[in-house]
Amino acid sequence: MERIKELRDLMSQSRTREILTKTTVDHMAIIKKYTSGRQEKNPALRMKWMMAMKYPITADKRIMEMIPERNEQGQTLWSKTNDAGSDRVMVSPLAVTWWNRNGPTTSTIHYPKVYKTYFEKVERLKHGTFGPVHFRNQVKIRRRVDVNPGHADLSAKEAQDVIMEVVFPNEVGARILTSESQLTITKEKKEELQDCKIAPLMVAYMLERELVRKTRFLPVAGGTSSVYIEVLHLTQGTCWEQMYTPGGEVRNDDIDQSLIIAARNIVKRATVSADPLASLLEMCHSTQIGGIRMVDILKQNPTEEQAVDICKAAMGLRISSSFSFGGFTFKRTSGSSVKREEEMLTGNLQTLKIRVHEGYEEFTMVGRRATAILRKTTRRLIQLIVSGRDEQSIAEAIIVAMVFSQEDCMIKAVRGDLNFVNRANQRLNPMHQLLRHFQKDAKVLFQNWGIEPIDNVMGMIGILPDMTPSTEMSLRGVRVSKMGVDEYSSTERVVVSIDRFLRVRDQRGNILLSPEEVSETQGTEKLTIIYSSSMMWEINGPESVLVNTYQWIIRNWEIVKIQWSQDPTMLYNKIEFEPFQSLVPRATRSQYSGFVRTLFQQMRDVLGTFDTAQIIKLLPFAAAPPEQSRMQFSSLTVNVRGSGMRILVRGNSPVFNYNKATKRLTVLGKDAGALTEDPDEGTAGVESAVLRGFLILGKENKRYGPALSINELSKLTKGEKANVLIGQGDVVLVMKRKRDSSILTDSQTATKRIRMAIN
């Protein structure tokens, strides 16, 4: 106060004011500070005094021909004096206005393409809905979040190569575009940005926004997907929140969400198979999410979630060093421990063999709805500070911490036998047994834990065994805090190993993850997940089995049709047709199979009755063990949508619809893919299928020996000719192609030539 008073007195004297306002700044240090280096030291001030001048802008001399000296109001737009020290003209800010209104216009077609992320953000905000503002204490915790909606997931290096290739294609320097996403993006962007007049550097910056995930460690209460983070400043303050529903979704959030669902489903399915690790890898490699291979997404996507991390570990990728227990992510922040096997008795006198952690340790625990700080020593909880959204979430965190502490009173609180099993009907390990037991009912645990009087500490209150808050007493060592505990910020990744039962360990042998930790929560994926592995088809019920079976046939049609003609039994026994059998009513399964197999045999025998769409449609029915009967069917029943639906043997139905015009197949209203050939080529097509790689030269020529069967064709060498027996005893002369490039057109030409050769 004294100093301020003194200053006021000084300022009231006119001499002081004069010294301060009129004296030149001639102190060398000050002059140095403001004049050394190219960096502007006070940009705001510089801008203010520059704009106060009449001609603060310099421009190329050509501007004098492009802009009049005065505008409509008679104000001068540029000065005849040259800019000191350069060959440029001094220009007024009014010239900018004139240029914007009357200057030449260029095509704006590229702007929405280059500034795509901004245009999309405006759309999202336009269609978003902002709800009421609520005033309440915000429990924010810092989380690593994605701040850049609408990006691909390329690494910085991959993006750099794409940007160089798109924006500066003629620059020297090695660029290797290897991944599928790199190639697709490069091709797409080159087409979009043809003849683009926007400054290349700007285009490069904007491309970077589109290609690379940018994460920040920010305090968040609520949604963490990028479409919420972009409006974080509008939706949550220190003591208020505003409800907001985004006006659109972005692909990167959808990928993150769909990846988690796919990974959870795959881990759950792998757990019950004979070799979980091998099955998991097979499924990861054969699954596509939104049209991208799941393994490619796993390599690039930094999402940390238990199931996703198990899949990454299986692929040999590094993952975060934190471990998971009871749905919480634990990160040790100090201390250390050694592990020792110990046997203990539960309250029910059941013996448990537990790996005890000996030593003092501190952990942060972060879950979706609660966070905590835990201090513990050998089999004793010293302190647990927990914060959460509601009573339920806080209770969940307390149970997990109490079990993790391995305290004797927790083990003695067990009532009844522990015999929880996993999906594969194997007993859970003791720690998860205890966890499941208390998650079902923690009353005895809380009652036996003990309570203690508490001191009045700012921002902390106690919690009683019935989970009600209190300012006097609390569960021993447990306090509830208003402040959240930040997520572990480091993005460090460590090398891990995984065993065949999908338990993930760090290099010291500590278990970081196991299938027990995978959440049961089931959402609906935002992007289409295609599990090509037939192990996964049943996951989404009968409809999914139906769609996936037909998609598999279409994808593998080339091989399927050859097997259909040459080795049908092998085809009928394919594992991919197994899930489909559960849809066919048990009573008619073998009758359908016998009927379809007979029908197929007739098609093979009678030339020209081959109908691709019909074979695809009926093939799955032929997989059941057949019953030889004379029964004919005009439609076959499948059990989907809770009732029997009919597939017509000839013609379309809601279940199976082939559109001749678009050549696309729709199963239960879902697109199942396109047929690459026209089924109506009356495709004497089995022959044409089998004769891929052969040229049909005409009618039989006896010089080339007796007619071979289709199966014997494989013996021919390139360029060799032979007579072949096709269909019902017709013989044509063929030659094995010398090169493979034109194989694609063979099936169409073969069909036409067979007809010509026979007629």
UniProtKB/Swiss-Prot annotation:
Biological processes annotated in GO: 7-methylguanosine mRNA capping; cap snatching; DNA-templated transcription; symbiont-mediated suppression of host gene expression; symbiont-mediated suppression of host mRNA transcription via inhibition of RNA polymerase II activity; viral RNA genome replication
Record site feature (Avian adaptation), residues: E627
Main localization of the protein described in the UniProt heading: virion
Protein location: Virion; Host nucleus
GO cellular component: host cell nucleus; virion component
Pfam hit, one: Flu_PB2_5th
UniProt GO molecular function: RNA binding; RNA-directed RNA polymerase activity
Gene3D superfamilies in UniProt: Polymerase Basic Protein 2, C-terminal domain
Short sequence motif named Nuclear localization signal, residue ranges: 736-739
Keywords (A to Z) from UniProt: Cap snatching, Eukaryotic host gene expression shutoff by virus, Eukaryotic host transcription shutoff by virus, Host gene expression shutoff by virus, Host nucleus, Host-virus interaction, Inhibition of host RNA polymerase II by virus, mRNA capping, mRNA processing, Viral transcription, Virion
Domain of life from the UniProt record: Viruses
Subunit-structure text: Influenza RNA polymerase is composed of three subunits: PB1, PB2 and PA. Interacts (via N-terminus) with PB1 (via C-terminus). Interacts with nucleoprotein NP (via N-terminus).
Stated role: Plays an essential role in transcription initiation and cap-stealing mechanism, in which cellular capped pre-mRNAs are used to generate primers for viral transcription. Recognizes and binds the 7-methylguanosine-containing cap of the target pre-RNA which is subsequently cleaved after 10-13 nucleotides by the viral protein PA. Plays a role in the initiation of the viral genome replication and modulates the activity of the ribonucleoprotein (RNP) complex.
Family, per entry: Belongs to the influenza viruses PB2 family.
Name this polypeptide is given: Polymerase basic protein 2
Organism of derivation: Influenza A virus (strain A/Equine/Kentucky/2/1986 H3N8)
